[in-house]
Protein backbone atom coordinates (compact mmCIF):
# COMPACT_ATOMS: atom_id res chain seq x y z
CA UNK A 1 0.00 0.00 0.00
CA UNK A 2 2.70 2.46 0.98
CA UNK A 3 4.63 1.69 -2.22
CA UNK A 4 1.91 3.18 -4.45
CA UNK A 5 2.16 6.65 -2.92
CA UNK A 6 3.88 9.14 -5.23
CA UNK A 7 6.70 10.86 -3.32
CA UNK A 8 6.94 13.80 -5.71
CA UNK A 9 3.30 14.74 -5.16
CA UNK A 10 3.77 14.53 -1.38
CA UNK A 11 6.85 16.75 -1.60
CA UNK A 12 4.99 19.30 -3.75
CA UNK A 13 2.11 19.43 -1.26
CA UNK A 14 4.50 19.89 1.68
CA UNK A 15 6.39 22.70 -0.05
CA UNK A 16 3.12 24.40 -0.96
CA UNK A 17 2.06 24.31 2.71
CA UNK A 18 5.33 26.00 3.70
CA UNK A 19 5.50 28.68 1.01
CA UNK A 20 1.80 29.47 0.57
CA UNK A 21 0.43 28.77 4.07
CA UNK A 22 3.42 29.69 6.25
CA UNK A 23 3.65 26.25 7.89
CA UNK A 24 7.04 25.06 9.13
CA UNK A 25 8.52 22.02 7.40
CA UNK A 26 9.05 20.34 10.79
CA UNK A 27 5.25 20.48 11.24
CA UNK A 28 4.24 19.48 7.71
CA UNK A 29 6.75 16.74 6.89
CA UNK A 30 6.42 14.11 9.69
CA UNK A 31 2.75 13.23 8.97
CA UNK A 32 3.62 12.75 5.30
CA UNK A 33 6.63 10.57 6.15
CA UNK A 34 4.31 8.25 8.08
CA UNK A 35 2.54 7.52 4.78
CA UNK A 36 5.63 6.14 3.05
CA UNK A 37 8.00 3.23 3.58
CA UNK A 38 11.11 3.66 5.71
CA UNK A 39 13.17 3.43 2.52
CA UNK A 40 11.34 6.40 0.98
CA UNK A 41 11.34 8.69 4.03
CA UNK A 42 14.87 9.90 3.35
CA UNK A 43 14.10 10.73 -0.30
CA UNK A 44 10.93 12.62 0.66
CA UNK A 45 12.96 14.64 3.15
CA UNK A 46 15.69 15.30 0.58
CA UNK A 47 13.16 16.56 -1.97
CA UNK A 48 11.45 18.90 0.52
CA UNK A 49 14.64 20.26 2.09
CA UNK A 50 16.37 20.53 -1.27
CA UNK A 51 13.60 22.47 -2.98
CA UNK A 52 13.34 24.90 -0.04
CA UNK A 53 17.12 25.32 0.00
CA UNK A 54 17.17 26.25 -3.70
CA UNK A 55 13.70 27.80 -3.96
CA UNK A 56 14.75 31.13 -5.50
CA UNK A 57 16.67 29.34 -8.27
CA UNK A 58 13.77 27.02 -9.06
CA UNK A 59 11.34 29.96 -9.04
CA UNK A 60 13.58 31.87 -11.47
CA UNK A 61 13.82 28.86 -13.80
CA UNK A 62 10.05 28.34 -13.85
CA UNK A 63 9.53 32.00 -14.74
CA UNK A 64 11.90 31.50 -17.68
CA UNK A 65 10.33 28.22 -18.80
CA UNK A 66 6.64 29.13 -18.48
CA UNK A 67 4.80 32.07 -20.00
CA UNK A 68 2.15 32.16 -17.25
CA UNK A 69 2.40 31.20 -13.57
CA UNK A 70 0.12 28.53 -12.12
CA UNK A 71 -2.47 30.11 -9.85
CA UNK A 72 -5.21 29.12 -7.42
CA UNK A 73 -5.84 25.40 -7.04
CA UNK A 74 -3.19 24.65 -9.66
CA UNK A 75 -0.33 25.96 -7.48
CA UNK A 76 0.49 22.40 -6.44
CA UNK A 77 1.53 21.79 -10.07
CA UNK A 78 3.92 24.76 -9.78
CA UNK A 79 5.64 23.06 -6.83
CA UNK A 80 5.56 19.67 -8.54
CA UNK A 81 7.53 21.19 -11.43
CA UNK A 82 9.97 22.56 -8.84
CA UNK A 83 10.43 19.05 -7.46
CA UNK A 84 11.17 17.83 -10.98
CA UNK A 85 13.71 20.59 -11.64
CA UNK A 86 15.42 19.94 -8.31
CA UNK A 87 15.87 16.26 -9.17
CA UNK A 88 17.38 17.08 -12.55
CA UNK A 89 19.75 19.65 -11.04
CA UNK A 90 20.83 18.20 -7.72
CA UNK A 91 20.18 14.46 -7.41
CA UNK A 92 21.60 11.28 -8.89
CA UNK A 93 18.14 10.07 -9.85
CA UNK A 94 18.29 9.13 -13.57
CA UNK A 95 16.59 11.90 -15.57
CA UNK A 96 14.09 9.52 -17.21
CA UNK A 97 12.99 8.28 -13.77
CA UNK A 98 12.79 11.80 -12.35
CA UNK A 99 10.60 12.90 -15.26
CA UNK A 100 8.35 9.84 -15.16
CA UNK A 101 7.75 10.00 -11.40
CA UNK A 102 7.14 13.75 -11.44
CA UNK A 103 4.66 13.49 -14.30
CA UNK A 104 2.87 10.68 -12.42
CA UNK A 105 2.65 13.04 -9.46
CA UNK A 106 -0.04 14.93 -11.37
CA UNK A 107 -2.13 11.75 -11.46
CA UNK A 108 -1.67 11.26 -7.71
CA UNK A 109 -3.16 14.69 -6.97
CA UNK A 110 -5.93 14.23 -9.58
CA UNK A 111 -4.54 16.77 -12.05
CA UNK A 112 -4.04 14.42 -14.99
CA UNK A 113 -4.63 17.22 -17.47
CA UNK A 114 -1.26 18.73 -16.49
CA UNK A 115 0.88 15.66 -17.31
CA UNK A 116 1.81 17.06 -20.71
CA UNK A 117 2.65 20.48 -19.30
CA UNK A 118 4.95 19.06 -16.61
CA UNK A 119 6.69 16.79 -19.09
CA UNK A 120 7.11 19.65 -21.58
CA UNK A 121 8.55 22.11 -19.06
CA UNK A 122 11.05 19.59 -17.67
CA UNK A 123 12.18 18.49 -21.15
CA UNK A 124 12.54 22.13 -22.21
CA UNK A 125 14.79 22.66 -19.19
CA UNK A 126 16.93 19.69 -20.21
CA UNK A 127 17.40 21.20 -23.67
CA UNK A 128 18.20 24.71 -22.39
CA UNK A 129 19.94 23.83 -19.12
CA UNK A 130 23.40 25.17 -19.91
CA UNK A 131 22.26 28.57 -21.20
CA UNK A 132 19.68 28.98 -18.43
CA UNK A 133 22.23 28.25 -15.70
CA UNK A 134 24.75 30.59 -17.31
CA UNK A 135 22.20 33.41 -17.23
CA UNK A 136 21.16 32.54 -13.66
CA UNK A 137 24.76 32.85 -12.42
CA UNK A 138 24.48 36.64 -12.75
CA UNK A 139 21.18 36.99 -10.90
CA UNK A 140 20.67 38.06 -7.26
CA UNK A 141 18.60 34.90 -6.85
CA UNK A 142 21.84 32.87 -7.11
CA UNK A 143 22.43 33.49 -3.38
CA UNK A 144 19.27 31.45 -2.64
CA UNK A 145 18.08 33.94 -0.01
CA UNK A 146 15.30 36.56 -0.03
CA UNK A 147 16.69 40.03 -0.71
CA UNK A 148 15.64 41.52 2.64
CA UNK A 149 17.66 38.88 4.48
CA UNK A 150 20.61 39.19 2.12
CA UNK A 151 20.62 42.95 2.77
CA UNK A 152 20.63 42.38 6.54
CA UNK A 153 23.56 39.96 6.27
CA UNK A 154 25.50 42.42 4.10
CA UNK A 155 24.90 45.24 6.59
CA UNK A 156 25.76 43.17 9.67
CA UNK A 157 28.71 41.27 8.15
CA UNK A 158 30.17 43.30 5.25
CA UNK A 159 33.23 41.03 5.00
CA UNK A 160 31.70 37.70 6.01
CA UNK A 161 28.20 37.81 4.49
CA UNK A 162 29.09 35.68 1.48
CA UNK A 163 30.55 32.93 3.68
CA UNK A 164 27.43 33.09 5.88
CA UNK A 165 25.16 32.67 2.86
CA UNK A 166 27.23 29.84 1.41
CA UNK A 167 27.20 28.02 4.77
CA UNK A 168 23.42 28.46 4.96
CA UNK A 169 23.08 26.79 1.56
CA UNK A 170 25.08 23.69 2.54
CA UNK A 171 23.73 20.44 3.92
CA UNK A 172 24.26 20.46 7.69
CA UNK A 173 26.65 18.08 9.44
CA UNK A 174 25.31 15.66 12.05
CA UNK A 175 26.69 16.52 15.48
CA UNK A 176 26.18 14.39 18.57
CA UNK A 177 26.65 14.98 22.28
CA UNK A 178 28.12 12.09 24.24
CA UNK A 179 26.58 11.64 27.70
CA UNK A 180 29.58 11.82 30.03
CA UNK A 181 27.55 10.05 32.74
CA UNK A 182 27.82 6.86 30.65
CA UNK A 183 31.00 7.07 28.56
CA UNK A 184 33.84 9.40 27.79
CA UNK A 185 33.82 10.79 24.28
CA UNK A 186 36.78 8.60 23.28
CA UNK A 187 35.08 5.47 24.64
CA UNK A 188 31.95 6.19 22.65
CA UNK A 189 33.95 6.88 19.48
CA UNK A 190 35.40 3.36 19.80
CA UNK A 191 31.87 1.96 20.08
CA UNK A 192 30.95 3.94 16.97
CA UNK A 193 33.85 2.43 15.03
CA UNK A 194 32.91 -1.05 16.24
CA UNK A 195 29.52 -0.43 14.63
CA UNK A 196 31.09 0.45 11.29
CA UNK A 197 30.86 4.24 11.53
CA UNK A 198 33.42 6.99 12.03
CA UNK A 199 33.39 10.48 13.47
CA UNK A 200 35.66 13.20 14.76
CA UNK A 201 35.75 15.44 17.81
CA UNK A 202 35.28 19.19 18.16
CA UNK A 203 38.34 21.11 19.42
CA UNK A 204 36.26 23.40 21.65
CA UNK A 205 33.33 21.37 22.96
CA UNK A 206 34.36 18.32 25.02
CA UNK A 207 31.25 16.18 24.46
CA UNK A 208 30.82 16.83 20.72
CA UNK A 209 31.27 14.24 17.97
CA UNK A 210 30.61 14.86 14.28
CA UNK A 211 29.62 11.84 12.23
CA UNK A 212 31.61 11.57 9.02
CA UNK A 213 28.39 10.40 7.34
CA UNK A 214 24.94 11.11 8.82
CA UNK A 215 23.13 8.04 10.16
CA UNK A 216 19.68 7.25 11.59
CA UNK A 217 19.60 7.51 15.38
CA UNK A 218 18.59 3.85 15.55
CA UNK A 219 22.08 2.97 14.26
CA UNK A 220 23.90 4.96 16.97
CA UNK A 221 25.36 2.87 19.82
CA UNK A 222 23.27 3.34 22.96
CA UNK A 223 20.94 6.02 21.61
CA UNK A 224 17.84 4.50 23.22
CA UNK A 225 19.80 4.05 26.46
CA UNK A 226 20.67 7.75 26.56
CA UNK A 227 24.37 7.40 25.79
CA UNK A 228 24.24 10.02 23.04
CA UNK A 229 21.99 12.88 21.86
CA UNK A 230 21.72 14.64 18.50
CA UNK A 231 22.72 18.27 19.12
CA UNK A 232 24.73 20.75 17.07
CA UNK A 233 28.17 21.66 18.40
CA UNK A 234 27.29 25.34 18.77
CA UNK A 235 24.22 24.50 20.86
CA UNK A 236 26.50 22.48 23.14
CA UNK A 237 28.48 25.66 23.75
CA UNK A 238 25.59 27.03 25.84
CA UNK A 239 26.09 24.61 28.72
CA UNK A 240 29.88 24.84 28.49
CA UNK A 241 29.58 28.61 29.11
CA UNK A 242 26.80 28.27 31.68
CA UNK A 243 29.06 25.92 33.72
CA UNK A 244 26.33 24.39 35.93
CA UNK A 245 27.39 22.95 39.29
CA UNK A 246 25.94 20.19 41.46
CA UNK A 247 23.64 21.47 44.18
CA UNK A 248 22.60 24.59 42.27
CA UNK A 249 19.10 25.67 41.30
CA UNK A 250 19.08 26.23 37.54
CA UNK A 251 16.45 27.55 35.12
CA UNK A 252 16.39 26.54 31.47
CA UNK A 253 14.05 29.11 29.92
CA UNK A 254 12.64 28.54 26.42
CA UNK A 255 13.73 24.94 26.98
CA UNK A 256 11.94 22.92 24.28
CA UNK A 257 12.84 20.45 22.88
CA UNK A 258 15.05 19.79 25.91
CA UNK A 259 18.53 19.27 24.47
CA UNK A 260 20.06 21.89 26.75
CA UNK A 261 18.02 20.76 29.78
CA UNK A 262 19.49 17.27 29.50
CA UNK A 263 22.97 18.67 28.82
CA UNK A 264 22.77 20.66 32.08
CA UNK A 265 21.86 17.45 33.95
CA UNK A 266 24.67 15.52 32.28
CA UNK A 267 27.15 18.19 33.40
CA UNK A 268 25.64 18.59 36.90
CA UNK A 269 23.47 15.56 37.75
CA UNK A 270 22.85 16.80 41.32
CA UNK A 271 21.53 20.19 40.17
CA UNK A 272 17.87 21.07 40.57
CA UNK A 273 16.64 22.08 37.11
CA UNK A 274 13.43 23.81 36.06
CA UNK A 275 12.66 23.67 32.32
CA UNK A 276 10.09 26.17 31.01
CA UNK A 277 8.68 26.78 27.54
CA UNK A 278 5.69 28.76 26.31
CA UNK A 279 4.72 26.11 23.72
CA UNK A 280 2.62 23.37 25.32
CA UNK A 281 3.01 21.09 22.28
CA UNK A 282 6.80 21.39 22.11
CA UNK A 283 7.16 20.86 25.87
CA UNK A 284 6.23 17.21 25.27
CA UNK A 285 9.63 16.84 23.56
CA UNK A 286 11.31 17.89 26.82
CA UNK A 287 9.54 15.05 28.63
CA UNK A 288 10.56 12.60 25.87
CA UNK A 289 14.23 13.59 26.10
CA UNK A 290 14.25 13.41 29.90
CA UNK A 291 12.64 9.96 29.78
CA UNK A 292 15.15 8.59 27.23
CA UNK A 293 18.08 9.85 29.31
CA UNK A 294 16.41 8.75 32.59
CA UNK A 295 16.60 12.23 34.08
CA UNK A 296 14.25 14.41 36.11
CA UNK A 297 13.48 18.11 35.91
CA UNK A 298 10.63 20.36 36.95
CA UNK A 299 8.98 20.96 33.56
CA UNK A 300 6.47 23.79 33.17
CA UNK A 301 4.55 25.57 30.44
CA UNK A 302 5.06 29.29 30.94
CA UNK A 303 5.68 32.65 29.28
CA UNK A 304 9.15 34.07 29.93
CA UNK A 305 7.70 37.58 30.18
CA UNK A 306 5.66 36.62 33.24
CA UNK A 307 7.89 34.42 35.42
CA UNK A 308 5.96 35.00 38.66
CA UNK A 309 3.09 32.98 37.14
CA UNK A 310 5.20 29.82 37.01
CA UNK A 311 7.98 30.25 39.60
CA UNK A 312 6.57 32.74 42.11
CA UNK A 313 9.43 34.62 43.79
CA UNK A 314 12.02 31.85 43.25
CA UNK A 315 15.57 32.94 42.44
CA UNK A 316 18.06 30.76 40.57
CA UNK A 317 21.83 30.31 40.77
CA UNK A 318 22.04 30.10 36.98
CA UNK A 319 19.65 30.85 34.15
CA UNK A 320 20.02 29.70 30.55
CA UNK A 321 17.88 31.91 28.31
CA UNK A 322 17.88 30.44 24.81
CA UNK A 323 15.78 33.32 23.57
CA UNK A 324 13.16 33.13 20.80
CA UNK A 325 14.87 34.49 17.70
CA UNK A 326 14.95 34.68 13.91
CA UNK A 327 16.92 31.40 13.73
CA UNK A 328 19.06 32.93 10.97
CA UNK A 329 22.04 30.91 12.22
CA UNK A 330 20.39 27.53 11.58
CA UNK A 331 19.09 28.03 8.03
CA UNK A 332 21.22 25.16 6.74
CA UNK A 333 19.27 22.90 9.14
CA UNK A 334 15.88 24.54 8.50
CA UNK A 335 15.87 26.06 4.98
CA UNK A 336 12.19 26.96 5.29
CA UNK A 337 13.23 29.74 7.71
CA UNK A 338 14.36 31.83 4.72
CA UNK A 339 10.84 31.86 3.31
CA UNK A 340 8.84 31.91 6.56
CA UNK A 341 10.56 34.92 8.15
CA UNK A 342 9.71 38.52 7.27
CA UNK A 343 11.86 41.63 7.70
CA UNK A 344 9.38 43.02 10.23
CA UNK A 345 9.85 39.93 12.42
CA UNK A 346 13.32 41.03 13.51
CA UNK A 347 12.26 44.11 15.46
CA UNK A 348 9.32 42.22 16.96
CA UNK A 349 11.62 39.42 18.13
CA UNK A 350 14.13 41.91 19.55
CA UNK A 351 11.32 43.51 21.56
CA UNK A 352 10.22 40.10 22.88
CA UNK A 353 13.79 39.21 23.86
CA UNK A 354 14.14 42.52 25.69
CA UNK A 355 10.93 41.91 27.64
CA UNK A 356 12.01 38.41 28.67
CA UNK A 357 15.46 39.61 29.79
CA UNK A 358 13.96 42.36 31.94
CA UNK A 359 11.35 40.02 33.43
CA UNK A 360 13.69 37.16 34.31
CA UNK A 361 16.65 39.19 35.68
CA UNK A 362 15.05 39.69 39.15
CA UNK A 363 14.85 35.88 39.42
CA UNK A 364 18.65 35.54 39.28
CA UNK A 365 20.41 35.43 42.65
CA UNK A 366 23.09 38.07 43.39
CA UNK A 367 26.37 36.62 42.15
CA UNK A 368 24.45 34.34 39.79
CA UNK A 369 25.01 33.76 36.06
CA UNK A 370 22.59 34.31 33.19
CA UNK A 371 23.64 32.99 29.80
CA UNK A 372 21.75 34.70 26.98
CA UNK A 373 21.88 32.68 23.76
CA UNK A 374 20.28 32.78 20.32
CA UNK A 375 20.70 30.85 17.07
CA UNK A 376 20.67 34.17 15.19
CA UNK A 377 23.45 36.05 13.41
CA UNK A 378 21.73 39.45 13.48
CA UNK A 379 23.13 42.14 15.84
CA UNK A 380 19.67 43.48 16.70
CA UNK A 381 18.98 40.22 18.52
CA UNK A 382 22.48 39.72 19.86
CA UNK A 383 25.20 42.26 20.63
CA UNK A 384 22.85 45.25 20.35
CA UNK A 385 20.30 43.52 22.56
CA UNK A 386 22.87 42.88 25.30
CA UNK A 387 24.44 46.33 25.02
CA UNK A 388 21.01 47.90 25.58
CA UNK A 389 20.30 45.56 28.51
CA UNK A 390 23.61 46.41 30.19
CA UNK A 391 22.95 50.13 29.79
CA UNK A 392 19.60 49.94 31.60
CA UNK A 393 20.52 47.27 34.19
CA UNK A 394 23.04 48.64 36.75
CA UNK A 395 23.58 45.31 38.54
CA UNK A 396 24.43 43.39 35.33
CA UNK A 397 27.96 42.91 34.02
CA UNK A 398 29.58 40.86 31.28
CA UNK A 399 31.68 37.88 32.31
CA UNK A 400 34.42 37.32 29.75
CA UNK A 401 32.21 37.20 26.65
CA UNK A 402 33.10 40.16 24.47
CA UNK A 403 33.43 43.81 25.44
CA UNK A 404 30.97 46.50 26.53
CA UNK A 405 30.95 47.91 22.98
CA UNK A 406 30.51 44.53 21.26
CA UNK A 407 29.22 42.23 23.99
CA UNK A 408 28.96 38.51 23.49
CA UNK A 409 30.50 35.82 21.31
CA UNK A 410 29.14 35.34 17.78
CA UNK A 411 29.69 32.03 15.99
CA UNK A 412 28.84 32.37 12.31
CA UNK A 413 27.41 29.30 10.56
CA UNK A 414 30.10 26.89 9.49
CA UNK A 415 32.94 28.95 10.99
CA UNK A 416 33.50 26.48 13.83
CA UNK A 417 31.81 23.59 11.96
CA UNK A 418 28.70 24.37 14.02
CA UNK A 419 25.58 26.42 13.46
CA UNK A 420 25.39 30.18 13.84
CA UNK A 421 25.03 31.00 17.54
CA UNK A 422 25.40 33.94 19.90
CA UNK A 423 26.26 33.81 23.62
CA UNK A 424 26.54 36.50 26.29
CA UNK A 425 27.39 35.54 29.87
CA UNK A 426 26.03 38.00 32.43
CA UNK A 427 26.73 38.16 36.18
CA UNK A 428 24.47 39.83 38.72
CA UNK A 429 26.58 42.09 40.96
From Swiss-Prot:
GO biological-process terms attached to the record: regulation of DNA-templated transcription; rRNA base methylation
Pfam families referenced in this protein's UniProt entry, alphabetically: Methyltr_RsmB-F, NusB, RsmF-B_ferredox
EC number from the UniProt entry: 2.1.1.176
Function: Specifically methylates the cytosine at position 967 (m5C967) of 16S rRNA.
PROSITE patterns, A to Z: NOL1_NOP2_SUN, SAM_MT_RSMB_NOP
Gene3D superfamilies from the UniProt entry: Helix hairpin bin, NusB-like, Sun protein, domain 3, Vaccinia Virus protein VP39
Enzyme type, top EC level: transferase
Entry similarity comment: Belongs to the class I-like SAM-binding methyltransferase superfamily. RsmB/NOP family.
Annotated CDD domains: AdoMet_MTases (cd02440), Methyltransferase_Sun (cd00620)
Gene from which the chain derives: rsmB
Superkingdom to which the source organism belongs: Bacteria
Residues holding S-adenosyl-L-methionine: 254-260, 277, 303, 322
Annotated Gene Ontology cellular component terms: cytosol
Alphabetized SUPFAM superfamilies for the sequence: NusB-like (SSF48013), S-adenosyl-L-methionine-dependent methyltransferases (SSF53335)
Annotated catalytic residues: 375
Location of this chain's protein in the cell: Cytoplasm
MF terms in GO: RNA binding; rRNA (cytosine-C5-)-methyltransferase activity
Protein name: Ribosomal RNA small subunit methyltransferase B
Record-linked InterPro entries: MeTrfase_RsmB-F_NOP2_cat, MeTrfase_RsmB-F_NOP2_dom, NusB-like_sf, NusB_RsmB_TIM44, RCMT, rRNA_ssu_MeTfrase_B, rRNA_ssu_MeTfrase_B_ent, RsmB-like_ferredoxin
Keywords: Cytoplasm, Methyltransferase, RNA-binding, rRNA processing, S-adenosyl-L-methionine, Transferase
Chaperone found in the keyword field: no
Catalysed conversion reaction: cytidine(967) in 16S rRNA + S-adenosyl-L-methionine = 5-methylcytidine(967) in 16S rRNA + S-adenosyl-L-homocysteine + H(+)
Keyword S-adenosyl-L-methionine: yes
Amino acid sequence: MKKSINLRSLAAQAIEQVVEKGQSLSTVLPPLQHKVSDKDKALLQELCFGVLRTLSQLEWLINKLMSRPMTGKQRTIHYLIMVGLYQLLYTRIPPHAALAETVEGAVAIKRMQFKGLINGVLRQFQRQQDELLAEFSGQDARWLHPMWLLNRFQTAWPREWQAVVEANNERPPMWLRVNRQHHSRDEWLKLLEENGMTGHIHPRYPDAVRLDAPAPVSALPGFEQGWVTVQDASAQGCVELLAPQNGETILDLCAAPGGKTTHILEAAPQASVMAVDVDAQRISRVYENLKRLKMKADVKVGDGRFPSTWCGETQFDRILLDAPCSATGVIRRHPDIKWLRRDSDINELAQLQSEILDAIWPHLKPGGTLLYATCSVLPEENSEQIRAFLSRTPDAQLDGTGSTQTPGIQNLPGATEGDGFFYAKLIKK
